[in-house]
Amino acid sequence: MNQSPAAFGPRRGGSPAVVAGAGARRNESQDYLLMDSELGDDAQPPLPAYGYYPCLRGTDSRLTHRRQTVLREKGRRLANRGPAYMFNDHSTSLSIEEERFLDAAEYGNIPVVRKMLEECLSLNVNCVDYMGQNALQLAVANEHLEITELLLKKENLSRVGDALLLAISKGYVRIVEAILSHPAFAEGKRLATSPSQSELQQDDFYAYDEDGTRFSHDVTPIILAAHCQEYEIVHTLLRKGARIERPHDYFCKCSECNQKQKHDSFSHSRSRINAYKGLASPAYLSLSSEDPVMTALELSNELAVLANIEKEFKNDYKKLSMQCKDFVVGLLDLCRNTEEVEAILNGDVEIHHSGGDHYRPNLSRLKLAIKYDVKKFVAHPNCQQQLLSIWYENLSGLRQQTMAVKFLVVLAVAVGLPFLALVYWFAPCSKMGKIMRGPFMKFVAHAASFTIFLGLLVMNAADRFEGTKILPNETSTDHAKQLFRMKTSCFSWMEMLIISWVIGMIWAECKEIWTQGPKEYLFELWNMLDFGMLAIFAASFIARFMAFWHASKAQSIIDANDTLKDLTKVTLGDNVKYYNLARIKWDPSDPQIISEGLYAIAVVLSFSRIAYILPANESFGPLQISLGRTVKDIFKFMVIFIMVFVAFMIGMFNLYSYYIGAKQNEAFTTVEESFKTLFWAIFGLSEVKSVVINYNHKFIENIGYVLYGVYNVTMVIVLLNMLIAMINSSFQEIEDDADVEWKFARAKLWFSYFEEGRTLPVPFNLVPSPKSLFYLLLRLKKWISELFQGHKKGFQEDAEMNKRNEGKKFGILGSHEDLSKLSLDRKQFAHSKQSSIRSSEDFQLNSFTNPPRQYQKIMKRLIKRYVLQAQIDKESDEVNEGELKEIKQDISSLRYELLEEKTQNSEDLAELIRKLGEKLSMEPNQEESNR
């Protein structure tokens, strides 16, 4: 039987050879599927074939058909390789055998690759094509799993790391698992090594070609998998011990950071961003952390801080911060019952449920969300419903009542506030006491108390609504020996009530500072308003008291003289006479005048404090938020405004300061007059004649006209309209997301009443309740017991150290053992400290020794739902061009597999026919021999 030419040999000759037997039929069957890589127009030069060397038939139709098929195959190859293929010749360093091997690996010709790997011992499996890619890279790029597995069995295979990164980027899970089973990843060190570290070791493990790597030099497999949101691949890498190292602090001055910054600052910044992209990936957050909610919240805040530090990458960091926030919102959205919502909002549910009968969720995660401005998380319906149930604690029936009923409840609480306070003093654990401890009742009680305080401020000025009874140039006394200042500086009963309210509010603020700490207290702007209001009230009352004290001293001098009966008939000394003068004759720095001025400012701030409770209402809440944003815009605008204002004020003053008394008015002649004129010019209340001079100095006057006109154009037309545009933009931002903004502001208001304590409103909080005294005694007892235990523990440690010293002194065996045990304990302590720092990122594979708590079970359920939802969303995306290309590659690979199966079947059939023919030919011979 004639054999076909060598399976891997080039085509020779110009006419088709006639081959007999099964081999000819086998080659004919491959004529339509295994084509040459090129075909000339007339001649037939030596061409590489994909499969076994085909025999051509002599008919013109068959030759024409083959040419058309080859041209189609060639066009597909050009399309796959891109335009660069048309401008790059085949590498002269490659043999025809290597070219055929690379083509077979690229197009999924499994039979050829297997046969060449088995039979061609001189084949270089690391040979590269015109683009510098070897067979492994080509097979992975075209998703040929079987070829990848065949190549991975070869020793000294290069660029395995780049193939892994390529498979991760394309999401080929099975290929990734196959590559990870390679001996190079047995120890796990390669997974933690980036391409840049491999280059330092002069290793081409992650190299794409001789020029460098395919991906960024700092990208490790786990970082790339996190970037691509490949959950299954991330899980596989995590199980093999891969982790993403958190970048050092931005201001870190360690030797490693300094070296990277000096060598290439841009690469250092990009490596930090790539690491944070991996850490902020939902795939990595959900699979790597024991507490993904806590990790995501902390990371979102860290990224927001970096966005303000690294301005050049601000958008990247803000996007990553928002990605972490969206991840937390996604987990909250997947909750199906109250227990799961509580687990996300509180953290470890079991620990906090063990607090006692009066359990109230601590909402530790929600505190962080409010602190880090995760507004969508706080405003989520699941979170809001949980907050609403806590808000109406012990008053669940009031939640469904109408607004009229709620208003009546508020009115009843305001009227009966003294009675409710009395009940809570003596029976804090009664039913009424529990109702008073509820957040809603605390809010109503505090709001009613503050409303009464504002009413007192109004009533304190009610006697002057129709005008003061004593004119500024008049004096009035109750009796003949009384000084006028004794009547005006003494405190009325209304003012004494106001002082009691102010002292109560100061005490409440002191308790809040003690509870929260100074840093957290100053973080809230409303606390700054309260602090300013109370400080001004206190300064006003102190100044008023000083005026009263000085007047009392003068009055005591009068009272000590029994001969004085009527002050109007005697001449008083200077130290006494002043306190009997009319208001218009008082010193400008008189304590009572200062007190009245400060009191007026404090009253304005007190009424502005009403805005704090406006977020409780859906109608007024967005308006209050817009007002707060407007105030921020005004402060930003004031920087530019002050620069322009001061420039023109100093310029106009320098121009007109020499013309005092020579102008039609005093504008711009002094700094004070310059300020007044320019300030009121903003509102159109300054006159044009402010720049006119009475003398014939036209040059100065014309310059004044020009500067004054430029000022009005700049301030009124440009800057004021810019301020209006800024305010309008801020209001539109609030309006576009009004529901989220309002719910977030309302949650912040509610949260201030969720904490234990501050049950009694002002001024009833000044009287210590029996409950407070009881808790104070308990704390003192606990402190004293801890103090004695500390001394006792210190004595025990001293005794133990003495024993050890005696053991060393007398040479007792085991002293070295004790020292080794002590050093071991120290090492274990240091190790536990480091592990606690990394606990939020590392897996704790101790579920067999430490069974998971309820919180861990809940988080595991939520993470499963999140991963499944992410996979469903990914699968529901439309088929893109890359997926169509993958389908083509699969069809191409299937073609070669079918051909191999057909060839094998043909060989088996030919063998059966041969055996059958031999058997049939042997039967006549046996019959003849039998005869």
Curated annotation (Swiss-Prot):
PROSITE patterns: ANK_REP_REGION (PS50297), ANK_REPEAT (PS50088). The chain crosses the membrane at residues 407-427, 439-459, 488-508, 522-542, 593-613, 637-657, 675-695, 707-727. The modification Phosphoserine is found at S815. It is a multi-pass membrane protein. It is found in: Cell membrane. Residues 1-24 are annotated as: Disordered. Phosphorylated by FYN, leading to an increase of TRPC6 channel activity. It catalyses: Ca(2+)(in) = Ca(2+)(out). The keyword Repeat applies. One of its GO terms (cellular component) is cytoplasm. The keyword Membrane applies. Residues 13-24 have a biased composition (Low complexity). GO terms for molecular function: inositol 1,4,5 trisphosphate binding; monoatomic cation channel activity; protein homodimerization activity; store-operated calcium channel activity. Glycans are attached at N617. Homodimer; forms channel complex. Interacts with MX1 and RNF24. NCBIfam families: trp (TIGR00870). PANTHER family: SHORT TRANSIENT RECEPTOR POTENTIAL CHANNEL 6, TRANSIENT RECEPTOR POTENTIAL CHANNEL. This is Short transient receptor potential channel 6.
